[in-house]
Design a protein with these regions (language model features):
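Bacterial N-terminal signal peptides that target proteins for export
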Residues: 1-8
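Bacterial N-terminal signal peptides
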Residues: 8-16
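Sec/Tat signal peptide C-region and signal peptidase I cleavage site
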Residues: 18-22
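Amphipathic alpha-helical segments
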Residues: 23-147, 164
Length: 168
């Protein structure tokens, strides 16, 4: 009986010590904030926003042109012969189909570009973070998105932002 209590006490003591020791080496980082607040990240966001706005303007212009053509064709419905109207309607339908394909293509290309830019950003900051954790003897860096609640003492986001801006 006495030895069981002793073993349980030792286990509790060891577990508490190991948890306390490991908690000191676990920190978290808000990657989104690093992207939004560093000069390199701001440049990436600015370029992506510019590309997105340009794409949206082109799509809107093409959509408006197609709507005008459709309205014009509707107004000419009674003037044109039935056969001529069908030919123009089919042509307009093909233009709408091409527009939809173009719209999908632009969206896919933008998503690819965005992913490439974000991957490049991660490749850029990864060695910086690795150097930081080596210097600070940190064992694990978690993404803030994956943490339910934690003390702000373990947040290294601001420090990483400063270091990335110095290296960027």
């Amino acid at each position: 009986m006495f030895s069981i209590k002793k073993i349980v006490f030792c286990l509790i003591l060891i577990l508490n010590f190991s948890v306390a020791q490991s908690a000191e080496k676990i920190v978290y980082l808000d990657i989104d904030q690093v992207l939004n607040k560093t000069n390199v990240g701001k440049k990436i966001i600015k370029n992506l926003d510019s590309l997105r706005k340009n794409n949206l303007q082109n799509i809107k212009k093409q959509r408006d042109d197609l709507k005008k053509k459709r309205d014009k064709l509707q107004k000419q419905k009674n003037i044109l012969s039935e056969e001529e109207f069908k030919v123009q309607a089919i042509s307009l339908e093909n233009e709408f189909r091409q527009f939809n394909e173009y719209n999908k293509k632009v969206s896919i290309e933008f998503d690819k570009k965005k992913q490439i830019e974000l991957d490049e950003f991660m490749k850029f900051i990864q060695p910086i973070i690795e150097k930081y954790i080596k210097e600070k003897s940190i064992t694990i860096v978690l993404n803030k998105k994956n943490i339910f609640i934690a003390s702000k003492d373990y947040d290294i986001t601001d420090e990483i932002i400063i270091i990335v801006d110095k290296n960027g």
